[in-house]
Amino acid sequence: MLLLWVATDWPLGLLGASYLASAHMLQFLIYTMAVAPLFWLGIPEWMARRIAGRLRLYRLMGRIAQPVVGGVLFNFILIATHSPWAVDNFRTNQFGSFLMDFVWLIGGLLVWAPIVSPITEHRMTSYPGRMAYLFLALGVVPAVPAGFLTFAGFPLYAIYELAPRVHGLSATTDQQLAGLVMKLGGIPVVWGTIVALMYQWSEATRAESATFRAKNNALSTPERLDQSNTEADQ
């Protein structure tokens, strides 16, 4: 809730809505890389199951937790809401800004659902699959629009180009900073999650190996061998 307030209220909310493309991009990162996954992680599984059952949303939640659905819809939202047309039209009024923020949050919930859904069976089961999904959906694809913003030689958004300058920051420099925020800002979250998944994978593999060895040892005990020999003699 604190991060949601920081992204929405003054000063970041005002700067992102009317003055700085870089603040706009920082809002996007907070909604999608922090608020969304923490929202899923903050819901106990029993509560999620009860809500899904009462509202008959279990099947729908399972479908939106598919990696193809989450990855495609998130990146569509990312590209659509950062197009010059969308920014210049939606950021000019309070309702449009609210709608854009809300769509970002929905996109974040969609893209993180296959990884941290509160309902266990809705998560991806393969650790390599989870890591590949995060790398592609949150690492590779967003780098494309980030590159356009970073290397564009002129302002793409009229609303930020015509806004009063903040601390003397030019519109082009501000836009380049926005591209860098989009490209680099999510790296700690994405790669931190990938490292955590690698550790979980290692621990799960170690536990499976220990269980397998324990079963083999149980089958190799003298009592088991004597029983096997007796059965063979009979």
For each feature predicted by the language model, list its residue ranges.
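Alpha-helical membrane segments of multi-pass proteins
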Residues: 1-234
